[in-house]
Amino acid sequence: MHTKRIIPCLDVKEGRVVKGINFEGLVDVGDPVALAEYYNKQGADELVFLDITATHEKRGIMEKVVQSVAEKIFIPFTVGGGLQTLDDIKSILRAGADKVSLNSAAVRNKMLIKEGAFYFGSQCIVLAADAKKRSDNTGWNVVINGGRIDTGLDLLKWIEEATALGAGEILLTSMDADGTKKGFDLELTKAVSDITNVPVIASGGCGCLEDFYDVFKSNIADAALAASLFHYGELTVDEVKRYLHDKNVSVRI
């Protein structure tokens, strides 16, 4: 079993971290740099920043955030949200991100994956796929725009196509499980893991220590991502890793 990764995720709007964060001893919980350092110290393997700023004009703010974070932490970090063009990807990578995550833009223009992988390498291009189960239970569709638009695209076909175009990793979010705290969607994660050779990051639904173990024990995910669980201090990255280590899951301690 490869070493499994634990990845906190932060939503950033206009240069500030949003979505309630509750840490004792952190003066400014809205500062992405302070939070990145905090998670880095806790032993996070990577970080994901999602820029949820609506307007393109404010993209420059995110570049400054990325630059400040890159100066302070020494773990890989991925930046996504609103990256539409090759130039957008280039500026975020140049600012110091290790990888970019492409979601809605890749669905609208799949050549962005191919060009990104060609210029920057597949290892830089993460396909963020948000999945929703079809009402007839025959599989999953890809949803975009934060889950608001059902593209009608079959998820598994889309992942096969995106990896063939050069996506080097899949950030897979179950929109059905997201926010429920009832555990990762194991059926979905396994279905994706079965059809691809690139690493899969499970996201959406994590509510307790056992949920991390469940997604790793059957070896259907290479990494697990969580947000509110870490932000509210319910668990620390270190606690998760020690628990997994005790359960014989290979993690970096």
From Swiss-Prot:
Its EC number is 4.3.2.10. Keywords: Amino-acid biosynthesis, Cytoplasm, Histidine biosynthesis, Lyase. Pathway: Amino-acid biosynthesis; L-histidine biosynthesis; L-histidine from 5-phospho-alpha-D-ribose 1-diphosphate: step 5/9. Signal peptide: none annotated. Coiled coil: none annotated. The active site is at 11, 130. GO terms for biological process: L-histidine biosynthetic process. One of its GO terms (molecular function) is imidazoleglycerol-phosphate synthase activity. It is an enzyme of class 4 (lyase). IGPS catalyzes the conversion of PRFAR and glutamine to IGP, AICAR and glutamate. The HisF subunit catalyzes the cyclization activity that produces IGP and AICAR from PRFAR using the ammonia provided by the HisH subunit. Heterodimer of HisH and HisF. Belongs to the HisA/HisF family. This is Imidazole glycerol phosphate synthase subunit HisF. It comes from Clostridium beijerinckii (strain ATCC 51743 / NCIMB 8052).
